[in-house]
Amino acid sequence: IENAESLGIDPDAIVVSGSSAGAITVLQAEWEICNGRQLASVLPDGFNYAGVMSFSGAIFPRQGGIRYGMEPCPMMLCHGTADKIVPYGQIWFFNIRFAGSSVISRTLRRKGYNYRFFRFEGNSHEIASTMCHNFDREMDFLEENVMKGRRVIIDTTLADDGVPVPDWAKGGDYRKLYNKD
């Protein structure tokens, strides 16, 4: 951010996106910023992203429920309801909550924050590799929610058999990571 001018970057127009661990990173970064956490102290006062796009992401809130001390930037969440690698709902690691997109969206909806959530019914972690598959949804989110600043809230479940399954997901063994099914 300190080199934004020399790089020709508008710091007010930065949108971050990630899938799986990258989605966890971008969602956690936004949570840290909105809650004034120590990790966000390296950023300029008042900085926030213009938007966040997450494909199979979650956060570690560490204390209590999912709360945002200030309104988060517009968020687009995509997650498979049967994800066993990054939880769609929530799990606990050593008394630390790992809250997925379904839990995050409840807070966003309850507070009336600017977000879109696309739940892929029955899909698993392959949603982490669907950035190209969701291109039209991404472009609409970027144009309407981010660039125009419109509060377009979408929270929907999709039954999409056309979601491509990457080679690493075809065997199904990855689904047994922390569940017995």
Question: How should these model regions be labeled?
Answer:
Residues 1-71:
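Primarily recognizes the serine-hydrolase "nucleophile elbow" in alpha/beta-hydrolase
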Residues 7, 19-21, 84, 100-107, ...:
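Gram-negative outer-membrane beta-barrel domains
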Residues 14, 75, 114-115:
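Hydrophobic anchor at the start of a short beta-strand
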Residues 24-28, 48, 100-103, 133, ...:
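Extracytoplasmic/secreted proteins, especially bacterial periplasmic and envelope-associated proteins
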Residues 32-34, 69-71, 92-97, 136:
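Glycine-rich, phosphate-binding/catalytic loops in enzymes
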Residues 77-79, 83:
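Short beta-strand/loop motif that positions the catalytic acidic residue
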Residues 84-100, 127-131:
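Conserved alpha/beta-hydrolase "acid-adjacent" motif
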Residues 109-181:
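C-terminal catalytic histidine-bearing segment of alpha/beta-hydrolase fold enzymes
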